[in-house]
Amino acid sequence: MTAATQFDQVSIVKRANVYFDGKCVSHTVLFADGTRKTLGVILPGALNFGTDAPELMEVQAGQCRIRLEGSDEWKTYAAGESFSVPGKSRFDIDVIETLDYVCSYL
């Protein structure tokens, strides 16, 4: 496997992060430099998330539409694309096809 498809020399938090009655499940990945990411799956449906820190969401598989707080515009994202969400904000996500994602906390 290449560096683009895996993370090496990391720690994984065993307990899953489960949100919205299991519609979103992720695991936290801890890096030696103190950074963290979550790897997760969101099932089809419409959800609203809040953020503490700014986030970069990288879509690994699936498709979704995103609307950032304060915007009327929906944008569509698919595998290989990413979007950023400001810290201390909210966003709507409409998952069209089961979403496999990596979330980086910036």
Swiss-Prot record:
EC category name: transferase
EC number annotated for this UniProt entry: 2.4.2.1, 2.4.2.2
Record field: catalytic activity: a purine D-ribonucleoside + phosphate = a purine nucleobase + alpha-D-ribose 1-phosphate; adenosine + phosphate = alpha-D-ribose 1-phosphate + adenine; cytidine + phosphate = cytosine + alpha-D-ribose 1-phosphate; guanosine + phosphate = alpha-D-ribose 1-phosphate + guanine
Keywords: Glycosyltransferase, Transferase
One GO MF term: guanosine phosphorylase activity
Family note: Belongs to the nucleoside phosphorylase PpnP family.
Gene: ppnP
Protein name, UniProt field: Pyrimidine/purine nucleoside phosphorylase
Its biological purpose: Catalyzes the phosphorolysis of diverse nucleosides, yielding D-ribose 1-phosphate and the respective free bases. Can use uridine, adenosine, guanosine, cytidine, thymidine, inosine and xanthosine as substrates. Also catalyzes the reverse reactions.
GO cellular component, one term: cytosol
One Pfam assignment: Ppnp
Domain of life of the source: Bacteria
Organism: Paraburkholderia phytofirmans (strain DSM 17436 / LMG 22146 / PsJN)
Classification via CDD domains: cupin_PpnP-like
InterPro entries cross-referenced by the UniProt entry: Ppnp, RmlC-like_jellyroll, RmlC_Cupin_sf
Coiled-coil ranges (or none): none
